Amino acid sequence: MAKNEQSREANQPIWFDGKSINEALFCDDFLGRHKIIYTNGAFFTPDGRVTDELPLRGEIFEELKCCAVSNIPRKISNIVELMKLAALVEDFPPEADRIHLANGTLFLDGSFTEGKPDIVRCRLPVLYNPDAPPPTRWLAFLDGLLYSEDIPTLQEFIGYCLIPSNKGQRMMVIKGNGGEGKSQIGAVLSALFGSNMKDGSIGKISENRFARADLEHILLCVDDDMRMEALRQTNYVKSIVTAQGKMDLERKGKQSYQGWMCARLLAFSNGDLQALFDRSDGFYRRQLVLTAKEKPADRVDDPDLAEKMKAEVEGILLWAFAGLQQLVANNFKFTESQRTKENREAVKRDNNNVFDFLESEGYIRLKADASISSKDCYDIYRMWCEENSLTALKRRSFSDALVAACGKYNLEHCNTITNSAGRRVWGFMGIEAVARPHINEFTDASQCTYVPEDWRD
């Protein structure tokens, strides 16, 4: 009997004394047998970030269930919390020169290392197969969806999303009239990126200060049906697109912290991404706007197309990697067709009609030695908007937009302009008034004059 007791005690783990579990010793023993660290609010293993702690808790339970102790669920919770302290590392920066895949690591120079020996921030659920056949179905789909000169831009952008880097400082919007099949791209990308991709909303990101924290550790955020409303704020969106290091993140009910942000933004929409107040060049310069072809009237849609294209994911990986290598060779400058550039300019002009006003005829004239007061210029602008059925900007917005356009149109904003009353006011050098909307007694009065019937011939 004594020998059996001694044998059972000898077989017991070091963290169990026969009556209770030593949680600290269990953590040391568990971490000694598993590659796992904790940083930036998440566990990381050789398979990437642990997105769900349930499998980890299940593995701990399998080791604890042999010990007849009470309240095992609480023990497991205590162990997980203790493990966060025991496995804590100060920092775990992203590695932008490699792509961790299901069977190894692919480097930007094209070399490949098999196996998963190291703990990584993210790992894509795709096998690297250099002999994978070309994704013919995927390429045929893109050929029917986009213009041929725009496909390299999409190829580079998808490749750009494979690495945790924001050096390209661009987001992408693919717009169409509906029914073209744009959303099929998102379905295929979910198979390529797995848990490293998230469905989100650019509108939510722009207005919710907690939304950025949801994109931590994510490579790609896809807005499958972007809202048509103009963004009231653009600073959150711009900060994500241009982030090249840690940024301030905030979760509800918790103190803000510094976290790595590498998420790229891809949106599908029936319209343009507009800003309600931000008319700066920077907001529009960061957009790659692709236009989908119109859907052929005789096209028959395949409901299983996405699943068929997902079967080509190994070939799609090679296709995207070729785009990434091309982007890196161009120093992260995207290939843009003339159509893409014109799309971006059209979006910018649609949200800021000041450019069209400055280039109009019959209202003002660009002349180097001329000048106009800000008030007179705005009155002429309102007249131009009224006669062209356009919505006029507010006075301050108009002035700010005109100041921003000074460099492009060789204008100068100064306070040395003399108005009709002889007072020195703010205005612009380089603009001459052609129309005179204030010749009537009332600025908003109609240009037509009412004539009583008795006076008519």
Summary of predicted features, one role per range:
Residues 31-56, 99-100, 105-219, 288-291, ...:
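P-loop NTPase catalytic core of nucleic-acid-dependent motor ATPases
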Residues 20-25, 190-195, 230-247, 399-400:
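A short, contiguous, amphipathic alpha-helix enriched in charged residues
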Residues 2-128, 260, 285, 373, ...:
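Intein modules and their embedded homing endonuclease domains
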Residues 77, 193-195, 200-209, 231, ...:
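Positively charged interface segments
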Residues 219-242, 257, 276-283:
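Conserved AAA+/SF3 P-loop NTPase catalytic/coupling segment centered on the Walker-B
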Residues 1-34, 44, 49-52, 128-144, ...:
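Replication-associated primase and helicase/ATPase modules
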Residues 217-220, 261-265:
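Loop/turn-to-beta-strand initiation segments
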Residues 310-352:
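Phosphate-handling catalytic cores of nucleic-acid transaction enzymes
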